[in-house]
Amino acid sequence: DAGRRRLLQLAAWASCAGAARASSIPVQIGVDAEFGLKDSTSAQAIEIGLRIAIAEVNAAGGVLGGRPLELVVRDNRSMPARAIAHFNAFTAMPDLVAVFGGKFSPVMMDVVPIAHELRLPLMAVWSSADPIVDHGRHPNFVFRLALRDSLAMPKLLKTALLRGFGQVGLLLANTGWGRSNLAAAERHLKSAQRPRITGVAWHNWGEKSLLARYMSLSESGAKAIIVVGNDDDVALLVRELATLPEEQRLPLLCHQGITGGKFAALAGPALQQVDLSVLQTFSFFSAEPERRDRFMKSAAKVAGIQSIEQLEAPTGTAHAYDLLHLLAIAIHRAGSADRTAVRDALEHLPTHRGLIKTYQPAFTPERHEALGEQDLLMARYRADGVLVPA
C-alpha cells in the first residue's frame, strides 16, 4: 500500500544518505616529524610530497569509493617522547590508516615497538638506520622508501675508492644512526677489503668544534673523510676546514643527513672551498622528464612551487610523494581502511610507475625496502646552494 511504499522510499533514502556520508568521511594519514626544529627542511619537504600526492589521489576520486585522503600533521621536534605520545594519539583516530615519520633514525627506532604493539603501519621516508625495518618482529608494520645505511655506507666507501682514496676516516654521529653506519661499513669491508679505514671519530650533536676529531683522522693517514652527521654539525666542520691551508682540506663524502636542513646557508662561502659530495637517492635534475613535469604541474597547483630549485630537501619530497601513492593503491586493494589489511596489501602491490622509478613491486613479504643500491647517486652543492648530480 501507499504507506508501505513511503516507508520503503524513506528507508532507501536514509540508506543512500548514510552511504554518501560514509563515502565523504576522510581516510586519514598521519605525519609526525621535526617541524619545530630550528632550520629543519626535512619535515617540511616530507609534508609537501604528501600534500601533492594526496591532492592527486583526491582529484582522481579518492579511495574506497570516493573517500578523500586527509593529512593530520604533528610536530615531534625530534624528541622520541613526543613522537611516542603522538603515535598513541594517532592510533586512537578510527579513520587513520598509517603514520609517516621524519628524518631522525633514533626517534623512529623508539617508535617501532609501539607501531607493532598497536598494529599501525609506520612509513619511513627519510630515516635510514637498518633496525627501523630489520627489527625481527612479524608481521612487520614498517615500510621504507628511503636510503638505508647498509646501502649508504658501501656506496660511500666504493665512491671513495673509485676516486682513488684507498684510506678513509669515518666521522660519525654518536647515535644509533652513526652506529648503524659503522656496522654497515664493517660488514662491507669483510668482503671488499678496501678502502682501508684508518680511524673512527665520534661526535655529539651541537659540538662547538669538530676540528680536533678531523685532524685525528687526517693524522691517521686518511685521504678522505666519510661523514655521518646532520646539517649544523657538518656545516661547522666545513667552516673550520676552510680556515686550514688548502693542502690540509681532505675531501668529505657525506651521508644524506646534511640535506635535511639549511646546510648550504649554514656553511656559507666556505662550502665552495671544500671538496664535499653527498649521497642521494634521487635528483629532479636527472629525473625522467615526463614524470618530473607531471609532478611539477601538481607542485605548482598545491604548493606554489614553480621550479626544481625551490624544492629544499628534494629527496624527502620525492620519497613521501611516491610512498603516499603506493599507500593509496594498498588502501584500494585492501578494500577498507583496516590497518592490518592495508599492511598486508602493501606487501602485494602491483607494478607502479612512480616519480623516482618504476616499482616492480615496491615491497614483498620478505622485503620492506622500496629502494636499492642501483637508486643511489652522489650530488654536490652549486654556488647557489642547490643540490645537483655530481
Describe each PLM feature range.
Residues 13-21:
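Hydrophobic h-region of N-terminal signal peptides that target proteins for export
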Residues 1-2, 18:
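Intrinsically disordered, low-complexity regions enriched in serine, threonine, proline
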Residues 3-10, 22-390:
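Extracytosolic ligand-binding ectodomains
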